[in-house]
Amino acid sequence: INPMGEVPVLVEPDGTALSGSQVICEFLDDVHPEPTLIGKHPMHRAETRRLVDWFDRKFNVEVTEKLVGEKFMKRFLALSEPDSAQVRAGHQNMHTHLDYISYLVERRKWLAGDELTLADVTAAAHLSTIDYIGDVPWDSHDPAKEWYARIKSRPSFRPLLSDHIPSAPPPKHYADLDF
């Protein structure tokens, strides 16, 4: 369906296939504009896109790939042993990113401003994956933890918290809204 052979892919009723998470999200925001997940004003939209890019590129490379890729995917796919230097780097980088999330939410209600946006959803998706393997040091990043608790408590996010990977259960706090 996707010439690049990647997910996600959204297939519309007429058979049109859209690929790429940002493309799909912006398409859905255009088709279902209320409430907007990108933002209404150009600067707000730009800030949302900047943060989506931050998490999908920078956070993904510096944290998600180093922790989930090394600790989980290598084991799950029986590829090789985790590279401990990569895992250590992922843990160190995680603190930097949680500090940045804390910085943002100490100044704004949500990551990109006063409204929940795709930036919050993107960041929460990455963090949820890492939280599933128990590698988010929430206790030393209270503002980020409070922001994530608000995301976790949203009805639209809760189904994600009940997903489990066979033979790899999440830590007890994973689905707890008051972690």
Region spans (language model):
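Short, hydrophobic secondary-structure boundary micro-motifs
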Residues: P35-K40, E62-V63, L111-D114, D139, ...
